[in-house]
């Protein structure tokens, strides 16, 4: 896709991973993307990660989660991110609660013709929007609770119209919850300021510099939690 540039980084902790992310085609005009962080570590967390990956891979597990079949052309309707999160909550909450787990998530749909990006967040770290024209960045805070607590869903979503050069970044809490030897959190504001400072770089380069900075901040190379970062740059809609 000539009008979109994706970048991602993943660094697993020393335990079995609970972070997953993906970018995929929904149809000729839409792309789906998500990032999920399953609580805890070990086999149970990995099991839920694999199960969620299968659920969100429509060719492997077509159950109407991402699309609803229709009798008339185009014979499907793409589910809004709010609906996808509500369906996952309905299917997984009781299973997760029984195992003492939960997961956080951001799910988004990008219209590759118009540049409209719709996002919904379930307890996950805030997605970061970086404007190319205004030279500013802000967190998209709309959303609802994590999945697995059995809480009522009151999810809010956000739709933004991307301009050429705009960036959106998703990251797991393994980044912002990194801790210095003095006990200070790296924090989401530090991430925002760092990526805004390097907004002229391709995201792949900016992510490498960010991870280098986090490692320097915490005084070690290893992370105590999984670290995953997923970002996109809207280049143009022509």
Question: What residue spans do the PLM features occupy?
Answer:
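… and, occasionally, acidic/histidine-rich disordered N-termini of signaling adaptors
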Residues: 1-167, 219-238
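C-terminal catalytic subdomain
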Residues: 86, 161-170, 175-238
């Amino acid at each position: 896709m000539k009008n979109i540039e994706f970048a991602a980084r993943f660094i697993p902790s020393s335990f079995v991973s609970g972070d997953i992310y993906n970018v995929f085609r929904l149809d000729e005009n839409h792309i789906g993307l998500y990032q999920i962080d399953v609580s805890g570590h070990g086999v149970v967390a990995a099991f839920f990660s694999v199960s969620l990956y299968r659920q969100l891979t429509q060719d492997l597990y077509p159950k109407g989660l991402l699309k609803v079949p229709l009798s008339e052309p185009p014979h499907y309707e793409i589910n809004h991110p709010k609906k996808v999160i509500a369906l996952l909550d309905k299917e997984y909450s009781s299973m997760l609660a029984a195992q003492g787990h939960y997961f956080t998530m951001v799910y988004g749909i990008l219209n590759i013709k118009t540049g409209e990006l719709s996002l919904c967040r379930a307890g996950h770290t805030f997605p970061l929007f970086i404007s190319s024209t205004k030279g500013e960045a802000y967190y998209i805070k709309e959303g609802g609770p994590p999945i697995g607590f059995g809480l009522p869903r009151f999810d809010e979503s956000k739709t933004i119209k991307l301009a050429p050069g705009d960036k959106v970044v998703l990251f797991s809490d393994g980044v912002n919850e990194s801790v210095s030897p003095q006990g200070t959190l790296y924090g989401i504001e530090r991430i925002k300021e760092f990526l805004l400072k390097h907004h002229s770089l391709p995201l792949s380069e900016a992510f490498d510099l960010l991870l280098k900075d986090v490692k320097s901040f915490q005084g070690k190379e290893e992370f105590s939690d999984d670290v995953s970062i997923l970002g996109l740059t809207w280049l143009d809609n022509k």
